[in-house]
Amino acid sequence: MLLAIKEFFNSLLLKELFKGLALTGRYLFARKITVLFPEEKTPLSPRFRGLHALRRYPNGEERCIACKLCEAVCPALAITIESDQRDDGTRRTTRYDIDLTKCIFCGFCEEACPVDAIVETHILEYHGEKRGDLYFTKDMLLAVGDRFEPEIAANKAADAKYR
């Protein structure tokens, strides 16, 4: 009974309200951690999933062996692959397209690839004025991979112990 009366007076005297206001005041005058995005950039994780790229081997040959695992595992059906068989019996892609308007950047394609041919880079700032500008062909994906290969290799090496 005595405890109930004490709790009634505490609530009547608005003890909880003042506790809440004190907490709000503490954070109101604390240092802000806002980042002004276009001028300042926060560091990205090695596992960040941005724009796709196709990689090549050091001898210049493209890595994709046309196994079509990435196409099969893609939940958004954003990847289209066509392949031909070479004279030596290996398969290579003749068409490798990714529709970025469909892609949900889940990373399943990257995980499914047995030869690390398809990767997602740290490029997050890309745009298109028309819908067709976000439809990446094999040549465009290879160009992205060629341009950012040192960064891609460094991120793969940094993330290797977690795979």
Swiss-Prot record:
Signal peptide: none
Compartments, as annotated in UniProt: Cell inner membrane
InterPro entries in UniProt: 4Fe4S_Fe-S-bd (IPR017896), 4Fe4S_Fe_S_CS (IPR017900), NADH_quinone_OxRdtase_chainI (IPR010226)
EC number: 7.1.1.-
Membrane topology category: Peripheral membrane protein
Binding sites annotated in the UniProt record for [4Fe-4S] cluster 2: 74, 103, 106, 109
One annotated GO molecular function: iron ion binding
HAMAP family (alphabetical): NDH1_NuoI
Subunit structure: NDH-1 is composed of 14 different subunits. Subunits NuoA, H, J, K, L, M, N constitute the membrane sector of the complex.
Name assigned to this protein: NADH-quinone oxidoreductase subunit I
Species this chain originates from: Ralstonia nicotianae (strain ATCC BAA-1114 / GMI1000)
Encoding gene (name): nuoI
